A protein has these predicted regions:
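Periplasmic c-type cytochrome electron-transfer domains
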Residues: 2-181
Length: 181
């Protein structure tokens, strides 16, 4: 699965692999992309694929109900390649094997003082209303402002490893966590 995830040779013109947008073991490239599968003019923040198989829906616009569907659609509509089912299953297995790296905000497994201060802000602003549970997501779609383009809103992403997934918000308009607030 890892081999297929990183293999650009099979896609149209042989230049793009899954790793192109999701480098470093399925994380995010920190870019906004305007993909044609949901219409032109809808730039979206590239999500990390960490825990994508247990935090549906997939893609920030929620257009894929499950990660298995998103993997196959990614090959078909982004890389313009029709994968064999066994290949797609291998990529699914690889993505399911990904685990978070230790946070630099933990000291001997405990929150640092900065992280404790951040937790107070998180609680005060009720971030946990949407970012809750073991993966810090309620697995729902939310409209998060007046300028939301999609009527159904946007997927609540996991906050696991959010310290390394800038920019933030569905369209990447917040370059830092401070800009989110």
């Amino acid at each position: 699965g890892e081999k297929y995830f990183n293999d650009a040779g099979r896609c149209y013109q042989g230049w793009q692999s899954c790793n192109g947008c999701h480098p470093g073991d399925g994380r995010t490239d920190g870019m906004n992309w305007d993909l044609m599968n949901d219409g032109v003019g809808n730039p979206k923040n590239c999500k990390s694929l960490l825990y994508s198989h247990v935090t549906p829906p997939n893609m920030i616009s929620g257009i894929r109900a499950k990660a298995e569907v998103a993997v196959r659609a990614g090959f078909r509509y982004i890389q313009f390649y029709e994968p064999e089912e066994e290949m797609a299953e291998c990529v699914d297995a690889y993505m399911k094997s990904l685990r978070p790296v230790p946070s630099p905000y933990l000291v001997d497994g405990e929150l640092s003082e900065k992280a404790k201060a951040g937790r107070k802000v998180f609680d005060k602003l009720k971030c946990g209303d949407c970012h809750n549970g073991p993966f810090y997501t309620d697995l729902k779609m939310h409209r998060i402002g007046e300028d939301v383009e999609f009527e159904k809103g946007w997927d609540t992403p996991t906050l696991v490893e959010c310290w390394r997934t800038a920019p933030y918000l569905f369209d990447g308009r917040a370059a830092t966590m401070q800009e989110v607030f």
